[in-house]
From Swiss-Prot:
Organism: Cryptococcus neoformans var. neoformans serotype D (strain JEC21 / ATCC MYA-565) (Filobasidiella neoformans)
Keywords assigned by UniProt, alphabetized: Cytoplasm, Initiation factor, Protein biosynthesis
Protein's name in the database: Eukaryotic translation initiation factor 3 subunit L
Chief place of localization: cytoplasm
Family under the similarity heading: Belongs to the eIF-3 subunit L family.
Amino acid sequence: MADPSAFYEPEEDELLSQLAIPVQNYQPLSEGDEYRRLQQLEQHAYAQQTAMAQEQEMEQLAVLELIPEDVKRFLVMFHQAILENDLPTITSMYESGWNKLTQAHYLNNEWPEAELIAPLVGNDQVFLTLYRELYFRHVYARLQPTIDDRFQSYENICELFNYLLNSEGPVPLDLPIQWLWDMLDEFVYQFTSFSHWRSSPKAKTEEELEMLAESPNIWSSYSVLNVLYSLVQKSQINEQLKAERAGKSVEEVTEVAGEYGSKPLYKNLGYFSLICLLHVHVLLGDPTLALQTMENVDLGNAAFLTRITACHVTTYYHVGCAYMALGRWPDAIKTFVSVLIFFIRMKQYHTRSYQYGSIAKTCERMYALLAICTTLSPGPSDENIMTIVKEHYGDQLAILQRGGPEALEAFKDLYLQACPKYLNVNPPPYEDASALEAWLANPPADATQRHLELFLSDVQAVQGVNGMRNLLKLYTSIDAAKLAAFSVSGEEEGEEEVLQQLMVLKSASSTYGRGQAETTLLDGERKVTNNLDFTIDGTMVHVEETTSHRRYAGFFIRNAEHAQRALTSIKSAPLPVRKPASSSAPAPATTAAPISKSGESAAPAPAEAPAAPEKKAGTWVPKSRQARIAA
């Protein structure tokens, strides 16, 4: 006889036990009766499951009817384009179609959940995972995410990256670079948002505290860094960039890239992961490691990252912040000025972009940081950019340059306004109630406040010698005793203090900066960051200003060469040929010569020369052209 246990799974025991009806005075049944009884219970259970599934399907169809028709058509076409790897259509629907439908239907509410639209796309799990990524990005951008949204977005993005990284081979998926950048940038943004939200236990409900205690690894810095480094390693992007910089052929670079890195999807994900690693390491307070991750990335005007304006601006902002954390003010100034010039030139092309608002905010923060850097390291800079800085932060800039306690407060306000929102590496210990109480009793200092204290200590060291620098500007040489009389009271003790301040000024006036031939972002040499230099010979201080004036020679040389080329082109151009008179035109009537009194015909009077064309005022004709016209 067949084994009854072979017709149902062990996990159905609980369901069958719930469906079983207790019978009074239960008598043992024979094997046949027991088998028939189990069959009836099994059929009843499956019938109940089928009814529940049909009921859920009916509810799903009813909800699906509430979705606008244009949204359903968009999702079906979007799914079809992704299946066919139709990159132009995917790009258009992602950058334009999605945002238009959001503005029309879901400006202040959520898009339909992935389970509701699953019948429209044949329950394609890859597409549904990509759809959830857009869904949660919309929730973070437009709405207030709940703790369930935060957890589910993390699980969804991990599912997507596991699919990309752990498949047996490269996945047959092709997405536009704008989507890939937005995906990784949103990944880092949601990580920072969750970290800031998690760092305040007092505002949490009991349910939220319990969920955080059960899931300590959700959005942990280790898991985020693990994903980014895995994408970098899978794509072999560092090896590819090194090969391209060495001038190797396309075939050699493809061989270096390997099976995964040769695919555009993995190569672009690896490239953008390097920039996201820069972002994360800056937020975690490790500027040196942040710049090391970018050692193979080109930051020139023709770099790959310049194809996406948001990526370009984000990269330069965090590189500049890393330089500021290392005290390399000239490098930070060059970085900020470079990307701000680019943004001004490209601004007209991005005013209608859906990312224009965030890009403009980042640029505004860079103007504030530029005001700080140019105060701490005065020197020549782009005049147009500095004009904008003075327009936006003119009052603060005057206070910064004047010095004093007000300047320190202005430095603090500008820094907090424009600096990155740094993260605490270790979250509160939610899994241990006693440790959490101790943490609440003595919470650690905020990461941004710690960076602010370090920054202000550097500012105070520089601001303390600003008065000495202003005095030195008035002299070419001055005795230390005389300088002490102007700066401090008590000539004997003041002279010693003056020498100490001069040494501090000398130290504060130099930093480590990149040279012309440097290749990586960390390479550099010692540079003077001040436009004032001095030497001490005994008790005499010899001062020399090193202000570099604007060079006009190159401007005149370029324009002279341009004028010479224009003149040569004019000389070599052929003269215009006047068209001959048409044969069909009537011949001019000839007037008979007048008869003189002697009967001889008089010679015809000479025709008047045609009047010279009137020269237009303000026109200039080269002399060589005039000579040829006269000839």
